[in-house]
Amino acid sequence: MSVQGFGVHTSMWTMNWDRDGAERAIAAAVKYKMDFIEIALLNAPAVDAAHTRALLDKHELSAVCSLGLPESAWASVRPDAAIEHLRVAIDKTAEMGAVALSGVIFGGIGERTGVPPTEGEYENIARVLTAASKHARTRGIELGVEAVNRYENHLINTGWQAVQMIERVGADNIFVHLDTYHMNIEEKGAANGILDAREHLKYIHLSESDRGTPGYGNCPWDEIYAALAAIGFRGGLAMESFINMPPEVAYGLAVWRPVAKDEEEVMGNGLPFLRNKAKQYGLI
């Protein structure tokens, strides 16, 4: 994937990617000298792709898009709807000039059946990702599968599970997307997920244990960075902290209280902390 260096999830400034949100978020990302941004495609058809592309080009900023599937298009039970939803999102990603569509592209945030995943669910997901990868290839887009914690989804919780799905599909334009917040819950150790996914890992969310300011929780940052350095990671390092969320997103992520004072606290303290660690371990 062509995205490298340090980026930030634009939830730091907005979860509504309209023209105003795009202008504010991109201006802020430029201010903090980010290499790329991650844009949440909560409503892909409504995004003014030409406007976003012009802003990205103007500021020479790269972008990745991300999403979780709505219940009406959960891949495990509604594969045809998921294929169509991802087709629209992939097209919008390409039109915006972004290089990848990642996140919970296999299911929904909050999708749980109450029982372990079934072979039928995984077969449906593989079918969806196969179709999506073929369409993404025609648009020059890569796809990322993000392993998320058991409370948000029951299907892919660890780096190894993400690898298993990617190898099941067998498409070379799908990569593993890890997240330190989820890893801190699901992996035996932070390094385990990174080592398990090393052949496919191209993108990682750097998110604190409470989703707040990095460096002020209990994520084992030295272990994380040491493992990334050990595998020669050269993908995207994306800081993710949820400050501005609409109620439906807060519900899906189970965030019920402020996790940081404001964006200045996260960008002023958390970002330098993460960048300094990355420099310490030779990642940037």
Annotate each predicted stretch with a short phrase.
Residues 48-60, 128-136, 193-196, 223-228:
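Catalytic-core regions built around general acid/base machinery
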Residues 23, 35, 39-127, 234, ...:
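Structural motif corresponding to the early beta-alpha repeats
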Residues 12-14, 41-43, 69-72, 107-110, ...:
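Active-site-proximal loop/turn and secondary-structure-junction residues that shape catalytic pockets
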Residues 7-10, 37-38, 66-67, 102-105, ...:
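Short beta-strands and strand-loop turn motifs
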Residues 19, 58, 78-175, 185, ...:
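Active-site acidic/histidine proton-transfer and metal-coordination neighborhood
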